[in-house]
Amino acid sequence: MASHIGKLPIAIPAGVEVKIEGQNFSAKGAKGSDSYVVPEGITAAVEGNEIVLTAADDLRPTRAKHGLARSIMAGMVKGVHDGYSKTLEIVGTGYRAVAKGQGIEFFLGYSHTITVNPPEGITLKVTDANHVVVEGTDKQVVGQVAANIRKLRAPEPYKGKGIKYSDERILRKAGKAGK
């Protein structure tokens, strides 16, 4: 019984260059390049315009790594071809973001401003004072940077003020009951 996810082939889109040397996998595309070390017990091969992964045995840990490796490699191929992005929305009176060099300066109701500088391979854009876009080729890093920015002022449940993902719904609570 093989991994259901692992046995699916990964389509290589036009414009993406894939290299497999032993356990090292690298992908290069229009948006950038990325590399990954394939776990032991998993072999990757390019067949035509697809990447096929095979597991050495059928043990549970190997099956888990098989699916994991396939998902990570598929994400890398998509990342170097299309890229990943997350949009954050800033809600609240006086809360805003301003581009400052490579990074962004946030005014979030604290006594000080907060400057966020992106790691390598990530770009931060301020579309307007209340919207920030995090873009990059690595899905995990894009999500982590977006989560770190959201954490600066997480949305509160009473008025919904704070930084939220653009597709996130904030669960609202009723305020205290009056007399």
From Swiss-Prot:
GO terms for cellular component: cytosolic large ribosomal subunit. GO terms for biological process: cytoplasmic translation. It holds the Pfam family Ribosomal_L6. PROSITE patterns: RIBOSOMAL_L6_1. It comes from the Bacteria. GO terms for molecular function: rRNA binding; structural constituent of ribosome. Keywords: Ribonucleoprotein, Ribosomal protein, RNA-binding, rRNA-binding. PANTHER family: 60S/50S RIBOSOMAL PROTEIN L6/L9, LARGE RIBOSOMAL SUBUNIT PROTEIN UL6M. This protein binds to the 23S rRNA, and is important in its secondary structure. It is located near the subunit interface in the base of the L7/L12 stalk, and near the tRNA binding site of the peptidyltransferase center. Belongs to the universal ribosomal protein uL6 family. NCBIfam families: L6_bact (TIGR03654). Part of the 50S ribosomal subunit. This is Large ribosomal subunit protein uL6.
